[in-house]
A protein has these predicted regions:
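HAD-like aspartate-dependent phosphatase fold
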Residues: 1-124
Length: 124
């Protein structure tokens, strides 16, 4: 489920954005799935991916962010073989989003290195 995001920035001769940027008021959220918006379901138990329920507060918050025009991309440790069940689950629970990235390495020792400020939030 993806919606076109309006980007700002200079255009090339074809009218395409060069190094596109989000407007300053738009946040770009990168959200984990398991243990963050639903119970922690390991890849070894894919049958639970179908039946787990999203956390109500997470549903409300993500819907608000999406409706406010922010970008929601899920970044999950689920593998590509879990993509279809994950997309079905997101649709079943009416979770709107812009992108789904699979294959995040498991573990909690994440470091994001960028030339811009990166803000990390623990979603509780």
């Amino acid at each position: 489920m993806s919606e076109e995001i309006q980007l700002v920035g200079e255009k090339n001769e074809l009218g395409e954005s060069i190094s596109p940027q989000l407007p300053s008021e738009v946040k770009n959220f990168l959200i984990d799935i398991d243990g963050t918006i639903t119970d922690d379901v390991p890849n070894e138990e894919p049958e639970r991916m179908v039946t787990c329920l999203p956390y109500p507060d997470a549903l409300e918050t993500m819907a608000k962010w999406y409706d406010e025009g922010h970008v929601l991309t899920f970044f999950t440790s689920r593998t590509e073989e879990h993509r279809e069940v994950t997309e079905i689950w997101l649709k079943k629970h009416s979770i709107k989003y812009h992108g789904l990235l699979m294959g995040k390495p498991r573990g909690g020792n994440y470091h994001w290195i960028d030339n811009h400020i990166v803000r990390a939030t623990r979603f509780e």
